[in-house]
Amino acid sequence: MNGARELLLVLMAWGAAQGASAQNAATVNPELVRVRYIVNDVPASVAFYTTNLGFKLDMQSGPYFAALSRGGVQLLISPAKGPGGASQPMPNGERPAPGGWNRIVVYTPDLQGEVDRLRKAGVRFRNEVVVGLGGNEILVDDPSGNVVELFQPTYGATPK
């Protein structure tokens, strides 16, 4: 019963943050791209994305959920364990876990400057800068081991 109560509180907070009245429901943009990352610690992940990568906190429901945005993408952060649907096991028993190789890509006009700034902030890197055909990239881990790619296009322009 405690898990159901916690889930209800999360949903109520989410609804309140979204202005879940019939009038305001029409303002939610169904075209907005949303990405969900499973994390070990929602507050630590919120701090990482807002402090280091320029995301804006849209809403947070304690340690159970947060929505952040940057440009036209909304990042949904859910814990690996908790009352929310994203943390529930699959029918085969497999549980959601952070990490892996799927990733969001953050464009930057100055990759080396970002690398220097993030190294000083103690961010963990998976590799060194890779020079590719379309640009240069490097991979960093968020506090839960989810990958974020920092990318500078070959021509130095950030897509609009």
Indicate where each model-derived feature is located:
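Vicinal oxygen chelate
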Residues: 21-33, 56-109, 115-141, 152-160
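Short, contiguous alpha-helical
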Residues: 142-148
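Bacterial N-terminal signal peptides that target proteins for export
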Residues: 1-8
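C-terminal segment of classical bacterial N-terminal signal peptides
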Residues: 14-21
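Conserved active-site tyrosine of GNAT-family acetyltransferases
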Residues: 45, 49-50, 118, 145
